[in-house]
Design a protein with these regions (language model features):
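N-terminal pre-catalytic "stem/leader" segment of glycosyltransferase-like enzymes
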Residues: 1-54
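Conserved catalytic-core segment of nucleotide-activated headgroup transferases in glycan assembly
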Residues: 3-18, 138-144, 149-230
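A short beta-strand/loop micro-motif in the catalytic core of glycosyltransferases
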Residues: 48, 74, 108-116
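Nucleotide-sugar-dependent
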Residues: 54, 166, 221-228, 233-255, ...
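Membrane-proximal helix-turn-helix segments that form the acceptor-binding/catalytic region
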Residues: 64-68, 92-111
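Carbohydrate-associated surface elements
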Residues: 118, 136
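Conserved acidic donor-binding segment of nucleotide-sugar-dependent glycosyltransferases
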Residues: 276-287, 296-302
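A charged, aromatic-enriched C-terminal amphipathic alpha-helix characteristic of glycosyltransferases
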Residues: 285, 302-333
Length: 337
């Protein structure tokens, strides 16, 4: 693992740290697994890769090497491997032939772990040995313990990484409509960095003019970014619907739920696998629906509380990381047997 990002943090570092806390497992992180000698590798029963093994066409060779040493190869993947042309990595995927390489990996590893049943159905075409372990957040981690700052406005937050221009564009017209009316709402952008993408996000969230109806929250490290939710009261979760996004995980609803935020969310996969009472689900093209949801939640405290409690209870029951750590343990034991 050469760098720590949100993906590796949620899919490798946190869950395998939990597994490593169990007496019958030891999990180590290698900054550069390719540099490990055979003798170093032989002390391990399995290696776990996330999303890719090698981008230069050597993945199958690497897998065969592990197998020759008696080491099982586990592959964790949380996104579909074919990207739409609009995706910022599509050209890079094309140059390195990542889709074909990923299929080759899926066919040859001992176990695939993924995030949703929908994505698992795509993977099973190439490897029947696939298990679904959803993204979970560590409830004991300080960044997921709600500690809201005070505000005289109801704060509607969009907290996301870069490359979500198509998603946030869903909010542009509803926000402009809200700002034309006397509604006690403020729009909060979390994760801000001074670049073209976030400046576009800011234009959407502010309605094009920086006033006290808008707040900027700067980017935080991956182990702290959840604290951005303390500057929000309601989560806005827009997502375009296509073959790529429908294979993503529902993690934004998990983040909202643990921070006690009600959510207004696109009625698309992966979010609409949750019950309808957990959030306000809307069609992306329903400008008036998004406007009304923002207006109504800004005025109705009991409505905010009802949606927040419903989401939080569902998340705590179905996405409890300690529960899923036990499941992960049994899956690992099975593949290593």
């Amino acid at each position: 693992m050469n760098n720590l990002n949100g993906l590796s943090f949620h899919r490798l570092i946190v869950p395998f740290s939990k597994v490593s806390d169990m007496i019958d497992f030891q999990c180590d992180v290698f900054p550069d697994l390719d540099a490990a000698t055979d003798e170093q590798l032989k002390q391990y029963s399995a290696v776990v890769y996330q999303r890719e093994i090698d981008t230069n066409g050597k993945s199958l060779e690497i897998i065969k090497k592990y197998h020759s040493l008696g080491i099982k190869v586990i592959f964790d993947i949380d996104d579909i491997w074919t990207l739409p042309k609009s995706h910022y990595l599509s050209r890079l995927y094309e140059i390195h032939n990542i889709p074909a390489q990923t299929v080759e990996i899926l066919k040859n590893v001992d176990l695939v772990i993924t995030t949703t049943k929908h994505l698992a159905s795509k993977i099973k075409k190439y490897n029947k040995n696939v298990e679904v372990i959803p993204n979970c957040l560590d409830h004991e981690d300080e960044q997921w313990k709600s500690n809201k700052t005070k505000s005289d406005k109801i704060r509607f937050g969009y907290i996301a990484g870069i490359f979500h221009k198509e998603d946030i564009s869903i909010l542009e017209m509803p926000i402009r409509k809200v700002l034309r009316h006397d509604i006690n709402a403020q729009f909060v952008l979390g994760g801000y960095n001074d670049n073209a993408d976030y400046n576009y996000y800011e234009k959407v969230m502010s309605g094009g003019t920086l006033t006290d109806k808008y707040q900027r929250v700067y980017s935080l490290p991956v182990h702290d970014y959840g604290k951005s939710y303390n500057e929000t009261d309601v989560s806005l979760i827009p997502l375009q619907s296509n073959s790529f996004t429908e294979c993503k995980s529902e993690i934004k609803l998990l983040e909202a739920g643990l921070h006690g935020n009600p959510a207004i969310v696109s009625d698309v996969l992966p979010y609409n696998i949750l019950p309808k009472e957990t959030a306000i689900f809307l069609n992306n093209s329903d400008i008036n629906g998004w406007y009304k949801a923002i207006r109504n939640l800004s005025k109705d405290e009991s409505m905010r509380k009802e949606y927040a409690e419903s989401l939080q209870k569902y998340i705590e029951k179905h996405y409890n990381i300690n529960k899923w750590t036990k499941v992960r343990k049994q899956i690992l034991k099975s593949v290593l047997a």
